[in-house]
Amino acid sequence: MVFPWNIAKSAEEAFSRWAVKRVVKFLLKKKLGKLILGDIDLDQLDIQLRDGTIQLSDLAINVDYLNDKFDAPLVIKEGSIGSLLVKMPWKTNGCQVEVDELELVLAPRLESNKSSSNEASTSASTREDLHNIRLEIGKHENEMLMNAAKSASIDVHEGVKTVAKIVKWFLTSFHVKIKNLIIAFDPDFGKKQSEAGPRPTLVLRMTEIECGISEEQVSANEVSPDNFLGINRLANCVKFQGAVVELLNMDDDDDGDKTCDKKTSNDVTLIMTGVGGGFSGSLNFSIPWKNGSLDIRKVDADISIDPVEVRFQPSTIRWFLQLWKTFTSFGSDCFPSVSHSDFLTDSPTIPTNVMVTPPATLSLSGGQELEHDTTPNLQFIPDWFPSSFSKKEEDGEVDIGASVDQFFECFDAMRSYQSASGSQGMWNWTSSVFTAINAASSLASGSLLLPSEQQHVETSCKVSFAGVSVVLFFQDEVNWKGVSTRIHYLGAELRDISVSFQVCLHDLRLEGEVNSMEIADYCQGGNVVDTANAESQTCLIKDLQAKVQTSLPPFASSDMHSDSERLSEIVSDGFLFRNKGFAVKTLLVIAAGGSGFQFTVNFQSSKASHRGSNSFSLSLPPTTFWLNLHSVEMLVNLFNDVSESIPITSHERNQVASSSKSESLRGSVSICNARVILWFPFESISERFCNSLGQQFIVVDLSSSPPSDKERAKERSPGEMHFPSATRSICFSVGDASIYLVTSDLKDSETNSYHRQVEFSAYNILHTNNKTRHQLSTIGMFWQDRPTVSPWLVERAKMLATQEESIQTDKSGGRGLEFAAVATPKDQDDIYSRSRKEIILASSFCLYVHLLPLAIHLDSWQYSKLCNLIEEAKNWLSRMAANTAEQTEESVVCQTSLVVDCDSIDILVRPEPRMGIKKQLQTELPGSWIQFNLRVQKLNLMSVPNLGSVSGADFFWLAHGEGTLLGSVTGLPDQELLLLSCNNSAIKRGNGGGSNALSSRFAGLDFLHLQEPGICNDYLAVSARGCTISAVGGRLDWIEVATSFFSFEDEKKTQEINSSSSSGSSFILNFVDVGLSYEPHHENTDHLRQASDPWVACLVAASSFSLSKKSLVDSIRNDYRIRIQDLGLLLSVDFDLSKLGGTYSSEHLHESGYVKVANDSLIEAILRTNSENGLLWELECSKSHLVIETCSDTTSGLIRLATQLQQLLAPDLEESAVHLQTRWDSIQQANARNDLDISDRLSSSDSSGEMKYLRLESENETGVIGLMDEINEDAFQFDVNPTYQSDSVECQNNYMSPHGISHGQAYNWVPATEKLPSNQSICGSSSRINSESSQVFLERESLPEIFENYCLSEFRPSSEVPQEGDSSGRELFPETDLRRGNSGWYDDASLRIVEDHVSEATEEDHEEHILDGECSSFGQTSYSAVAANGRILLKNIDLKWRIYSGSDWHDSRKKGENFKHTKGRDTTSCLELELSGVQFLYETFPIGEICTSKLSLMVQDFYLYDRSDNAPWTLVLGYYNSKDHPRDSSSYAFKLELKAVRPDPETPLEENRLRVALLPILLHLHQSQLDFLISFFGANSLEKPVVSMGDSGGSTMSVSVQGHNIIEEALLPYFQKFDIWPVNVRVDYSPHHVDIAALTGGKYAELVNLVPWKGIELQLKHVHAAGIYGWGNVCETILGEWLEDVSQNQIHQLLKGIPTVRSLSALYAAALKLVSSPVESYRKDRRLVKGVQRGTVAFLRSISLEAVGLGVHLAAGAHDILLRAEYIFASSPSLPQPQGRTKTNVRHNQPRNAKQGMLKACESIGDGIGKTASALVRTPLKKYQRGDGAGSAFATVVQGVPTAAIAPASACARAVHSALVGIRNSLDPEHKKESMEKYLGPDKQRKQDQHR
């Protein structure tokens, strides 16, 4: 204590009580007069000097003065003090002030905008003037101060020092205690609020609050320059208790008589309270001393608050939102001075120091000279004592009164100075206390200098809460006052909260920690029943949650339950105003353990940088979330309800958005251990009172080890690289993540049986694998302030989705090119990458997710459950979104994006095993698919709503890198089979050659979807690179199993999709380097084959495969365009899955033994669904060129591959096994009864070519009859003509053509075997009939009666079977073209086949139909009573098959040798089969109809070429075109039609009907070519030839099908009937040598090689048969019929092939013509001379041709002999012998006429003379000139004599041959054409004709 007690005694004795009151009143009036309203009455003042107390009572506060001084956004409306007691320090340690019943009423400062703006402008102008004046004064006073400091020293008066010490001690020992503090806040929202009812007022009540200032003393050894008088820090302590925050409903008629504390409880809404009716706390505030003054740059504060309870209800939330809106709307009017003060403070023109000096007459002593540079930041106190002094003062006597007055004058001057320098408002009152302490300290130390106003540097504050409880009611208090009302609320409990923040000049750092947290859902019932069951229901819920937790793996927060039991239960029951019930508690969130919640926040103001930068980090403790979406829904509804009452305008929203965008934000959240449990169904558990507890849960587990600070500093979020321009971002870091599906064992019928003990099972369906433990999965949210509006992004995305750029590249490349531009793939990759970046940068918000390697495990049951739960959650979200959308107004459309990156993903699904799989499909790989495993790398996902800020433009992008799909079957559960691979090794594979220019850089898949607004178009594009699909064991049913697993059936959704077809769509599927591999799996099929049988695998590879579709609006028709570039087929023998190992590169395929056997450069097709012609689907392909290249072994491999696929794709015979055997037995019994084998009867025919019907005689027999009894053998006639014109033509050449019935066309008719009129005999039919006569009209009136029934033959009586002698005349009706489905086998009198397939008469029946098979008619709609539902149409297909000698596979391949070192094929020996203009049609018909399918095949031209280097000629097989066999340009060389019918639709038996027609064939065969064909097809390179089931013939071996023994032949295709129409064949055979050894050994076929065979013309008869099993039997029947007919009827045609016989036959025919022509001419027109002339000319021409032909052959033979002799004798180097051939074939370049022949003859003679001269002169002369000598030259002459002698003879022979060939070509142009086509080929011959 500074003063002793005697001072108080002397003061009491010196002054009287009245004087003391007067003095105290004077002092209080002087210092507190402005704070107190009115004058102080002496009756209100009580002074006890002995006790040291001064007391005032009933004081009113001058609110106007305070409001003017504070200048705050809040104003004090009224205030009062019940009692003010001041205790002097002589009985207490320091000065104490006690205030009782302090009441303040606050209100917002609500000035009008106009007045505020005027005042602001006036204040600004006034302050600017004052500021300028102050600057001028400051300059003048600075000069005076500098002069005074230099001239004299200053000494502070001792009296002032004494007063300063007293004041300093008083201020540092000041204590204030306030009891019963009430602060009310009346927001005064306006008239509308007051008119609506009571006005809520926010009230803060405190029982007691105490504030004191003290000094922290330090020891002597700790005294430093920063300490002052041993004082280290100035401490300020504030303590309060009993604090309560509440809302009072104040009425307008309330006055001062009705104070706040007199309100009833019904008018009070409690907001914040504590355990004992209020909360308490303390605030410790300290400031350090530095250089004798307070260092306010560093302030430390420590706040501690006891447990607090915060309560909210809708009305209070609504009130606070309205309050916030009011403050924000008037914020600009509340801070005009603050903004101006900041302006002045920041102004650079303000001087840093303002110095003032006392008058110059002042006498200072003891002072020291001050230098400017040593005290730059100090200020003098101006005018701190008056200018005149008394003598006593000059003598040093202390005048205390004068010293007091002088001190307070200095204090007022200091306050005035600070007010003038800009310190105004609330801070002026706060900082003046510290400034006064500084002033007192300076004066007490004898210093006249005051420190300048210090800038704040750092403030440290620590706030700790023992606990915080938050209660949120979903209803207002007025709604649950009734006893029976149910109360529903949420309670949150937070324990041990510690928050510390550090405020610097431009930065703010906030750190906090929360030890534990619990959030629960409470529901308290109002009736007695609910109250009685509440406790048991709470236990049931806890038991349920405990069982769910037990079913899950151990979690880090499993020990939190013990902590939660210790949490306070104040939020459950104790706080309620009525304690009549117990609330049912449902735990929602519990977080405890570890280091708790830890968060750090850093704020950097915009003054420190160009843009303020804020950051925060949050670390979560082990947390468990029980997410009940019903509670979330209630929260959302509460928010919507509250927001309705306080709508936010768009202007306010824009202001908030603009203010929030001024600073950047970076946040990071680290989730170490968290468990989220989603509760299903979405109902409030507490409201339902556990009648039906949750049965299904989705649990998400997140766990990771928190990274260290160094690792966190080094880490950079991957999202920041994708979104560098983001101004605000929040990143969540997660380590390992797992998702579980938890289900109960309750059945649906036991749902409400909650009393039963329920057990739960957890299934891990998703988890991440953090192998390194250093990497974390991240979830980032990024915001951008001003994203660029880019509507052009929609067009860019449309280009990507439609792949327009790649299509344009293909078009620019031109048709027929195998490869496109090389730069296209790289450019496309660049476009994808650039577009992805542009889309991300144009987003205002981006959610980025980066996942570690992810694994998903699901079975079908789990997936269905998960889909149901997700669907329920989606419905909930859509409902909530709809409710929220109704409350919100439209805002600006902004683009947002979701980006997901995953390092790898592993999806394992287990579908249910399927039953009823085809047994044939399981031939190689038995079992059902039970598991699929999909593994992909680098998964990227992007979802962008409102792309380019265009409303409704949604874009989705999914991409991944390499990947594989593995599968397992029940037969091999432990073995995974590769089903699909997407590998970089397959890049550039193309068609297997490894040179695909369309390849991309990396393998992968891209899935793009764009929904374009406005026109409502959907664009979908799927692109895959390096993809190979595997059909292990020939099974591709895994595609259906996999897709059906993920197809979640929803009938309503399907109906909605089907009904919403009003929008157009576009779909593109594009594959690059795609392949389809068939890999036989023969591990378990050894019993089906012998060990020596090899297996063949194949791979169909393509450089590019694209499928595109565009759907029109309101159209069900879809057209899919298919485009395949560079297609190849590769084969491999003895295939083993271990060879490939999942690698399908071209190099590895070649090493594994794959050989390319077929390729096609371009294939274009169209697949139509729901087409206009009534077809469900239709596939059309045109203009394709297929090239097949094989050797003998690969050809056998193709055959074996077809056999393997046939066994896999064969129909299931289990259902039809009994019917197959019954059909076989019926036919065999019928054959036995008739004692006639079917094959013998089919081969019978008469000499005229008529065919007899195959009928089974059964007149007197009963029983089972053959199925073919009722088949009319002429039912398959191609064309008929009702009228026949006679002409004298040979019978063997009579047939009818489809177009004009001309010779040479395919036969479209069947010769009638019934009795025909004489004018319709076959032999007398015309060979040339006009096309008009061939047109047949089918009139409606002429239709016979149609029987629409069909009876199986075994159930029909024998009387109905037609008899053999039934010869009733019948009309011939034409059948439609190959695509028509109309067909009928009926007669006017009797119906032979009575089937339901006869069509009704249609409009087309009135039109004429010509059965010509033209291309124009091929492919038209089928007009049948039952239309086809599917169709495959191939048009203008070109096929080339090249067969080479050699082998593609080495013979020692089984020894493990590398296929890379095989010998390979010999390309010098090659035959090529060319089919051009191929038309193919296949139609399917609906199930239940008689006709099941129809196949039609037509070939425009077919040729067989010899492409060998030593080929004797080019054309081997072709069309026989001659004057006797003319051909129409539109006719086809080959026609085939195959129909599959089902006589009984209810019986699964199909029977085939076949008909084939051929144009005349020309065969030029050389012996070498025949040997090549025999060696190629006769010797199978594979170990054992495939024995076709059709080759078994009459085998009686049986197989077992479903326990039934069935003959193997009965399983073969059954041909109800087939027709092979007559065909003419012209054969030329040139032998090369005769195998004498084989001939002598009995091989008499060598006799054919003795002589050449020329011009053999054979007419192969029409073959008609019925009831044949197998293709092998069909071929045997056809060949047998033909051989028998040729051997019996056309042996003379073979003899004509001998050249001598042919010449004699020609001379005989010419001589006969010479005699018969005059006779015929005379008989016809009585002109004999003309006939003689014709006969003579014909005779002479025939003799000339034979003579010339003989000469040609002789000359050619002589030339060949002489040429060989010339090569033998030639020794000159100038005449080398050819390596492959011994002669030049002159026939390849034969003269076209006699003139050209003579020219070539002259050239030949000249060449011969030149050779002679060269041998005798030129060659010896060259040797002589080189210096060989005369002897050597003479020897050369002797050696050249034979050559010189033979060369002219050889040249003459060649000249004669050329001349004769020219003459023959002039006389016989037809032979010339045939010869040129033979040696040059048809194509080259046509080109030469065009050039000439």
UniProtKB/Swiss-Prot annotation:
This is Autophagy-related protein 2. Lipid transfer protein involved in autophagosome assembly. Tethers the edge of the isolation membrane (IM) to the endoplasmic reticulum (ER) and mediates direct lipid transfer from ER to IM for IM expansion. Binds to the ER exit site (ERES), which is the membrane source for autophagosome formation, and extracts phospholipids from the membrane source to the IM for membrane expansion. Plays an essential role in plant nutrient recycling. Involved in the negative regulation of plant defense responses to biotrophic pathogens. Residues 1357-1376, 1866-1892 are annotated as: Disordered. Residues 1367-1376, 1867-1892 have a biased composition (Basic and acidic residues). Its main location: membrane. It is found in: Preautophagosomal structure membrane; Endoplasmic reticulum membrane. Belongs to the ATG2 family. Disulfide bonds: none annotated. It comes from Arabidopsis thaliana. It comes from the Eukaryota.
